[in-house]
């Protein structure tokens, strides 16, 4: 899954939030001029793919927009931020080194923009240490894979951007859940949404035409088949190191039980605990296939 996906288009019936487009219009050419490959991540990527491309229902609302930014040095990252601030539309946030605040002139609303750098500044343990003190450490495991497996989405006009694919986004969510699951359930809730939506997000024909074994294994339950297919696809976009990391995670009964419980707690139908557990097991089976 190395950028082989066809170009995606926004459904006229599910237009993108205009504020998102207004953020992307100045950011895209500035990132290109600074030679910074980037992709849209987080909840914005989720909604672009699930809602705006495939027409599925909106998920958990959020106003911030996340980006993964590939840079070779901290100087290159600083230059990108300086050029964005110089437009007058973005301002630095002293409380968070990765954050800019976009002032939406059309609405008067301020939108947090998180720019997560990786690549040349990433340590062997997949972390980055923010200068100058280097005492703020951030885990960027999965970002290389998310960029490599990102998909192209035409936003309208002459604007086309890279967006984290659903497998890439799921990988990032697994890493985030592993890091902060004792502080918040939101990553588990997002993972549950991805698992339950994958079949309907452009994979129905694929399941019937190329993955009939999955449909038969789950008695033609599309959600369960989609969950295992997502697990397989996540494994396919992983580097060997990332794959070892997530396979170790899903092999832990204690961690899986905690993930399942958090999904149940965040579900609109907590009484469906058994169904959630089956979906998590199907997803994990996909990740562990051929291991």
Please state what every model-predicted region is.
Residues 1-291:
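Compositionally biased terminal segments of proteins
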């Amino acid at each position: 899954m190395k950028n082989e996906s066809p170009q995606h288009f926004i459904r006229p019936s599910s237009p993108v939030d205009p504020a998102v487009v207004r953020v992307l219009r100045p950011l895209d050419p500035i990132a290109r001029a600074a030679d910074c490959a980037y992709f849209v991540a987080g909840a914005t990527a989720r909604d672009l793919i699930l809602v705006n491309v495939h027409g599925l229902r909106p998920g958990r609302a959020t106003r911030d927009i996340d980006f993964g930014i590939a840079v070779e040095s901290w100087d290159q990252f600083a230059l990108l931020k300086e050029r964005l601030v110089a437009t007058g539309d973005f301002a630095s946030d002293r409380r968070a080194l990765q954050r800019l605040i976009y002032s939406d002139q059309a609405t008067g609303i301020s939108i947090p923009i998180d720019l997560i750098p990786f690549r040349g500044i990433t340590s062997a343990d997949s972390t980055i240490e923010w200068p100058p003190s280097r005492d703020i450490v951030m885990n960027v495991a999965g970002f290389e894979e998310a960029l490599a497996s990102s998909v192209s989405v035409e936003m309208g006009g002459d604007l086309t951007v890279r967006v984290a694919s659903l497998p890439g986004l799921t990988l990032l969510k697994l890493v985030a859940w592993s890091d902060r699951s004792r502080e918040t359930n939101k990553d588990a809730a997002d993972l549950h949404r991805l698992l339950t939506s994958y079949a309907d997000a452009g994979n129905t024909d694929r399941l019937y035409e190329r993955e009939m074994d999955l449909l038969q294994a789950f008695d033609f339950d599309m959600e369960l088949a989609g969950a295992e297919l997502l697990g397989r696809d996540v494994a396919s976009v992983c580097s060997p190191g990332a794959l070892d990391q997530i396979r170790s995670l899903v092999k832990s009964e204690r961690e899986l039980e905690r993930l399942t419980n958090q999904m149940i707690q965040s579900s609109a139908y907590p009484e469906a605990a058994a169904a959630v557990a089956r979906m998590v097991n199907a997803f994990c089976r996909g990740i562990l296939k051929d291991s």
